[in-house]
Design a protein with these regions (language model features):
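Short hydrophobic/Thr-rich beta-strand motif most characteristic of the beta2 strand and flanking loop
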Residues: 43-50, 58
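Charged docking surfaces used in two-component/phosphorelay signaling
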Residues: 33-41
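Receiver (REC) domain active-site loop signature in two-component systems and cognate sites
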Residues: 73
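Active-site beta3 strand of CheY-like receiver
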Residues: 62-68
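Conserved acidic carboxylate
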Residues: 26
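Non-catalytic signal-transmission and effector/linker regions of two-component phosphorelay proteins
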Residues: 1-21, 124-139
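Active-site residues of response regulator receiver
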Residues: 70, 100
Length: 139
């Protein structure tokens, strides 16, 4: 690798380090990929998990600035994941956005102190970006 390539690679690494990091948790592969690309285009670095258990491990191992999670997943629901994060000293202040389908509107209407925001699927890129920006200003 020549000096120009090294400089570009190092600049990319430094830029990624300055981006806020979102832990994305979604069991549907195509939805996860769509959300991952959407978040990256909004300027976020993304760590993706396919279920709540994987997300727990990633949250403990990586510094994260926000969590975007599906409500219904195998092994651990989005709300169970949120409660786990709120009970962890290091992670309790991380904003959590719960994504829910139309069929699960009850989850969004029930009071839950562990969730900062609810968005309905299919979520629009601008809606997600605006929600995360608002939560980051609050914290």
């Amino acid at each position: 690798m020549d000096n120009d390539e090294t400089t570009l690679t190092n600049a990319g690494i430094a830029n990624a380090a300055n981006q806020p990091c979102v832990l994305l948790v979604e069991d549907d592969r195509s939805a996860r990929r769509f959300l991952e690309v959407t978040l990256q285009r909004c300027g976020y670095r993304v760590i993706a998990a396919a279920d709540g258990l994987e997300a727990m491990k990633l949250a403990l191992a990586s510094p994260i600035d926000a969590v975007v999670t599906d409500a219904i997943m195998p092994h651990l629901s989005g709300q169970q994941l949120a409660r786990f994060l709120r009970n962890n000293e290091k992670l309790r202040r991380v904003p959590i956005v719960l994504l829910t389908g139309q069929e699960n509107r009850d989850a969004a209407s029930s009071p839950d102190d562990s969730i900062d925001a609810f968005l309905y699927k299919p979520v629009k890129a601008e809606e997600l970006k605006s929600c995360l920006a608002g939560l980051s200003r609050r914290n």
